[in-house]
Amino acid sequence: MSKILLLLIRFYQYFISPLLGNNCRFHPTCSEYAKESITLYGSLKGLWRAFKRIIKCQPFYNGTVLYDTEVRCHARKSGNPVKNKEPK
């Protein structure tokens, strides 16, 4: 089921998101966060986390958090490798 969800998210990123414009108030974007959450936590928990994130990504949410590192921090704590994009 995770593979299907990831394919749907990728479809959204490549075909639907460009039509809507860059409206996400978070970094990483909600769709990227959903991909990371599903990969780390599995289908159900990852979808739940993505749903909670998407609810916050609208103009009426009373919050100013723009940068969210929760998923990436979890990857470091759990021992999963995190790609370092800085030159050595």
UniProtKB/Swiss-Prot annotation:
Q: Give a yes or no for keyword Lipid metabolism in this entry.
A: no
Q: Which GO terms describe its cellular component?
A: plasma membrane
Pfam families associated with the record: YidD (PF01809)
Tell me the keywords, alphabetical order: Cell inner membrane, Cell membrane, Membrane
The protein's location, in the record's own words, is: Cell inner membrane
Q: Which InterPro entries match?
A: Membr_insert_effic_factor_YidD (IPR002696)
- What membrane topology does the UniProt entry give? Peripheral membrane protein
What residue intervals traverse the membrane? none
Keyword Cell inner membrane recorded: yes
NCBIfam families annotated for this entry?
Answer: membrane protein insertion efficiency factor YidD
Q: Quote the protein name from its UniProt record.
A: Putative membrane protein insertion efficiency factor
Organism name: Rickettsia canadensis (strain McKiel)
